[in-house]
């Protein structure tokens, strides 16, 4: 457990460094997210596992719903700025879920009806929301420092097995995963430099290493493997 007020005091004491690292991190975050949408539409394949999409969406929505906490209880510019930054990411994560629905039936439930697949996607979203809010109630992470790092790790550890199973790079690209590496490095660097000894532990650094190593693997795989043509979504012609 960390002291959130000590972290916010450190942010204020090192505001130039924090803004520099934070700006770079968020730029790569948006680069990673937007590139993934482009890749998914290009290849007609959802870029992220539904499990990851639903938890990301639930994570960011939960932060947005805590408006009074950030603007009332804490009333600190960093937490308020993060709130604003998560509005577009939440919208993008909703697009990811839509891409799973639009492109994913033939991969995930090829023998099922469209109605059954619709129910599956909706149930996954509800399960993600329920699961996240349940877990969050037990986490000692009041200002979402730990979970921002972990949710990134979730993206790469669910992407690797899916890529190996498909044996193609549909929905992926070198640029996308380079953005991921720099995004995660920016966040973990910020926490290690400014957020105190809780974020200077071997376990935290191991999580950072796992993100970077996984990102490097995805860069190499995206370069080597070509996006194989996938079945068109229902009602759309294959090109």
Where are these regions (language model features)?
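Alpha-helical membrane-protein topology signature
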Residues: 1-239
